[in-house]
Amino acid sequence: MKLYSVAYIPQSYEVLGLVKGSMVQSKHIGRDIMAGLKGIVGGEIKGYTEMLNDARNIATDRMIEEAHALGANGIIGISYVTSSLMSNTSEVLVYGTAVKILS
């Protein structure tokens, strides 16, 4: 599966449709405590960085599964959105256009 963030690729392709994947991740109380401390002293909150990277990877895998089900061999126009659903949860959504690259 070829993944592209651009909306158009130079190869000939057939558009198969929208594909998406999402992952909702809850924060761990231990991470919240460490995040609070980091908020005071500054610096990267590695636990949250790892959590969001894992969520992005899972969401991407789910999008790829949807594309495979349509018979796609590529996805173009990929975009990621991250949002907070509740006080202790984050959602990562990824979406793009499934395509069958012909050449």
UniProtKB/Swiss-Prot annotation:
- Please, which domain of life does this record's source organism belong to? Bacteria
Q: Which InterPro entries match?
A: UPF0145_dom_sf, UPF0145_YbjQ-like
The entry's family comment says: Belongs to the UPF0145 family.
This protein's name: UPF0145 protein HH_1800
Q: Which organism is it from?
A: Helicobacter hepaticus (strain ATCC 51449 / 3B1)
Taxonomic lineage of the native organism: Bacteria, Pseudomonadati, Campylobacterota, Epsilonproteobacteria, Campylobacterales
